[in-house]
């Protein structure tokens, strides 16, 4: 049997195209994060309890990106926080789990524009049953489901009217899923699976005998979840099919993401907690284990990050979006839709790197 080869962000480099762009100010980074919702900057703050808060979600929303409020709180607290975010920044996105989903949705729907379903594996009966229920329940908010990884998972959930996908399993900086289970796929190839599945699904929705074309407004979004470390990763995520990226680590350790309960003083220094949502700390804090501690299974890590008193959410986001704009000018694309998936359509040329190329790409003059 011949195994398929899979590539990650560090495995490829993009080649420039002819460009008639005279200024990066001409470029539009607006993207869709669900069927009915756009943002101006294709970056989403992950619903992790050590970076996602009312203040961080409001800041992300106000600068044109998006923050997703995490779900690990009482229903009443989540409702009140959703209201604060909605009132301060005009829209709110929040996470829900499968357990108790209906009660949470009913409590928060007045103040919520998009729901993110928090599940490790979107290719399962429970997720499909939930999505069938949600789409017939009368709620109007878009629903992002996942996590997906294969073409099958994306296509099946698209058929059930998902408005978008949290895509990829295992690339997050605090995620141990690939190490613990062997499940995962490098990000560029993983993004291709979602891009191809959505393209196939779009074609299945048109009547070819009437010479119809796919309706771009009916397409579910692809949101790459994890693995984003540098602006180049955002660029390559979009070039390989993503609409936007979901990030946690790049926002960890900032004063405007760390809530007071997640700040620790140690040896005269101030640290912020940062942890994966399947880490031992989270599983124990929220009692997510099954009956006894013997059934506690951990697929994430926890760490302390010295608080960065200089950088802000705005600085981080603008650094990434400026890198994206620069890449768009090299590639000759004026908007995200032109660029998205260009590796697969042939509008972007990519080369496979040698093992040593990563060192050339970093500043190395010191």
Predicted regions: what is each one?
Residues 1-212, 216, 221, 249-254, ...:
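Active-site entrance/lid segments in N-terminal catalytic domains of soluble metabolic enzymes
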Residues 1-25, 182-224, 229-366:
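Alpha/beta catalytic cores of nucleotide-metabolism and tRNA/nucleoside-modifying enzymes
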């Amino acid at each position: 049997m011949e195994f398929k080869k899979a590539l990650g962000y560090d495995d490829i480099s993009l080649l420039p195209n002819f460009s008639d762009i005279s200024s990066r100010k001409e470029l539009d980074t607006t993207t869709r994060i669900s069927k009915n919702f756009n943002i101006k900057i294709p970056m989403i703050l992950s619903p992790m309890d050590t970076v996602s808060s009312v203040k961080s979600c409001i800041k992300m929303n106000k600068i044109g990106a998006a923050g997703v409020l995490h779900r690990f709180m009482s229903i009443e607290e989540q409702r009140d926080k959703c209201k604060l975010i909605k009132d301060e920044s005009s829209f709110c996105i929040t996470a829900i789990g499968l357990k108790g989903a209906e009660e949470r949705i009913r409590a928060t729907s007045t103040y919520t524009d998009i729901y993110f379903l928090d599940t490790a594996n979107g290719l399962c009966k429970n997720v499909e049953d939930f999505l069938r229920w949600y789409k017939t329940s009368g709620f109007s908010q878009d629903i992002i489901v996942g996590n997906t990884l294969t073409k099958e998972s994306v296509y099946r959930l698209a058929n059930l009217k998902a408005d978008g996908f949290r895509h990829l399993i295992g690339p997050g900086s605090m995620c141990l899923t690939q190490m613990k289970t062997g499940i995962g796929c490098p990000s560029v190839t993983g993004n291709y699976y979602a891009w191809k599945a959505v393209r196939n699904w779009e074609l299945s929705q048109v009547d070819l005998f009437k010479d119809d074309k796919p309706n771009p407004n009916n397409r579910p979004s692809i949101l790459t979840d994890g693995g984003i470390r540098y602006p180049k990763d955002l660029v390559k995520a979009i070039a390989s099919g993503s609409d936007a990226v979901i990030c946690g680590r790049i926002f960890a350790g900032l004063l405007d993401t760390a809530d007071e309960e997640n700040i620790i003083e140690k040896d005269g220094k101030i640290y912020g907690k940062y942890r994966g949502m399947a880490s031992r700390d989270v599983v124990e804090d929220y009692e997510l284990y099954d009956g006894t501690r013997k059934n506690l299974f951990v697929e994430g890590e926890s760490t302390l990050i010295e608080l960065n008193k200089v950088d802000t959410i705005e600085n981080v986001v603008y650094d990434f979006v400026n890198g994206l704009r620069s890449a768009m000018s090299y590639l000759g694309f004026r908007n995200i839709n032109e660029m998205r998936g260009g590796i697969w359509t042939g509008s972007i040329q990519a080369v496979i790197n040698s093992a040593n190329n990563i060192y050339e790409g970093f500043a190395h003059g010191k």
